[in-house]
Structures are given as C-alpha cells and as structure tokens.
C-alpha cells in the first residue's frame, strides 16, 4: 500500500498492523476488493468485509452488506449523515476528517459531482468545528517539494502546437 501523504498528518490515522483479528470489517470508499492494498495482510480480510459504505456506482458488491449512494459526491458525505444517526457526536476532529473527504472528492466543490446535499454536508461539518480555512489551505494551496519539482519539470517541457491551441507536457519517471 502507498504511504499516507504528509498533507494528511493532522488526522489521527491508525494503520492496521496485523496484531489483532478484527471482529467487524468496514470498508469505506472502496469500490472493489482489488483496491484494498497489501499492507500487513489486509487482503486476508478483503473477502470478509461486513459492511461497505461507498459512493461509486461501480461498487462490485463484495461486502456482506453494502450501502452505496452514487448520487453522493463522496463517501464522507454519506458518513456525515450516518454518524449522528448512530448516536456519535460529530467532533471537530471527525468533522475535519470528513470535510477532507468531501473537499478532495469534489475538487474543493468544483467538480460536477457536487450537489446541494454536498454543500449541506459541508455546512454540518463546519458547524461541528471543521476549520475550513486551514483545511482548504493545507489540502489545496500547500505543495510538497516533490510536487513543485514535478511541476517545474512539466513546465520546462511545455510545447505549444497548432497556433497555441494544443499544449504538450512530457514527464518521465525513473
């Protein structure tokens, strides 16, 4: 599995270390078992998922129970509704994590999957304490050194064709 990017280090993420057998397995925003990754034998549980909460219409239905709403812009949008229904308070920490999911899946509310319900979910998360200014800056304005270097390489290779109607960028990875 890929490491968790540093831009998400404000979240309290615990990576499964394989030291226990989960009693209940919930997959969120995972449309198929092939997307589980390979970290610490997580594939051992991929075929034993009790519940999947997802917003992808392409969800393969691999879990014993599946909640899929392909009208939702993000699984985090669904969780914003579900968590209070389970009697759990939307704390500022939870709200920040869910806002991150909604904002990233919608391109900061610019993509066509963004609906009025998406904005209502974001409003609930803001009311619960998500620091939108800080989160949006971190998610969409800050760039890692590696990303800046990649952008530099891309721009250095930029060429225009057909009276500047077509632009070509070439990036190679070693």
Regions found by a protein language model. Name each.
Residues 1-45:
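N-terminal small/polar loop signature for handling phosphorylated ligands or for N-terminal nucleophile
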Residues 20-22, 46-47, 63, 163:
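Residue-level preference for short coil/turn positions at secondary-structure junctions
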Residues 24-26, 49-53, 65-68, 167:
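Hydrophobic/aromatic beta-strand patches that form the interior of the parallel beta-sheet core
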Residues 30-33, 56-58, 173-174:
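Short glycine-rich anion-binding loops that position phosphate/pyrophosphate groups of nucleotides
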């Amino acid at each position: 599995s890929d490491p968790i990017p540093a831009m998400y280090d404000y979240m309290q993420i615990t990576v499964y270390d394989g030291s226990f057998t989960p009693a209940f397995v919930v997959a969120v925003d995972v449309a198929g078992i092939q997307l589980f990754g390979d970290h610490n034998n997580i594939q051992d549980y991929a075929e034993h998922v009790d519940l999947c909460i997802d917003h992808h219409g392409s969800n393969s239905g691999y879990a014993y129970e599946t909640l899929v709403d392909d009208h939702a812009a993000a699984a985090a949008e669904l969780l914003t509704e579900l968590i209070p229904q389970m009697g759990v308070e939307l704390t500022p920490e939870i709200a920040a994590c869910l806002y991150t999911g909604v904002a990233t899946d919608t391109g900061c509310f610019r993509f066509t999957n963004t609906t009025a319900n998406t904005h209502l979910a974001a409003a609930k998360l803001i009311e619960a304490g998500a620091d939108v200014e800080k989160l949006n800056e971190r998610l969409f304005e800050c760039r890692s050194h590696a990303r800046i270097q990649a952008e530099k390489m891309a721009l250095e290779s930029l060429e225009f064709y057909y009276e500047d109607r077509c632009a070509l960028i070439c990036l190679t990875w070693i």
